[in-house]
Swiss-Prot record:
One of its GO terms (molecular function) is rRNA binding. It holds the Pfam family Ribosomal_S19. The lineage of its organism: Eukaryota, Sar, Rhizaria, Cercozoa, Imbricatea. This is Small ribosomal subunit protein uS19c. It comes from the Eukaryota. The gene is rps19. It comes from Paulinella chromatophora. Protein S19 forms a complex with S13 that binds strongly to the 16S ribosomal RNA.
Length: 91
């Protein structure tokens, strides 16, 4: 179930302030954030936001196709190392 339309999308206040400040000054430096649950808005297109994955910040360049998605979708938290090999012939 999605979020109610009357509430609007969730974006962390600190992240929104930083994006608005960069839009006003035409600055395109990387913005660090820990807010993986923030929704990507059209005003964020063209910015690079470093999203924390629990260990490091992963830079994500925001494009038009990402609008409406969450920042955390683009910074994976787990590393898949592959399935274990069959141990039948190892004896």
């Amino acid at each position: 179930m999605g979020r109610s339309l009357k509430k609007g999308p969730f974006v962390a206040d600190s992240l929104l302030r930083k994006v608005e400040k960069q839009n006003a000054t035409e600055d395109k430096s990387v913005i660090k954030t820990w807010s993986r649950s923030s929704t990507i808005l059209p005003m964020m297109i063209g910015h690079t936001i470093a999203v924390h994955n629990g260990k490091v910040h992963i830079p994500v360049f925001l494009t038009e196709q990402m609008v409406g998605h969450k920042l955390g979708e683009f910074a994976p938290t787990r590393t898949f190392r592959g399935h274990i090999k069959d141990k039948k012939g190892t004896r």
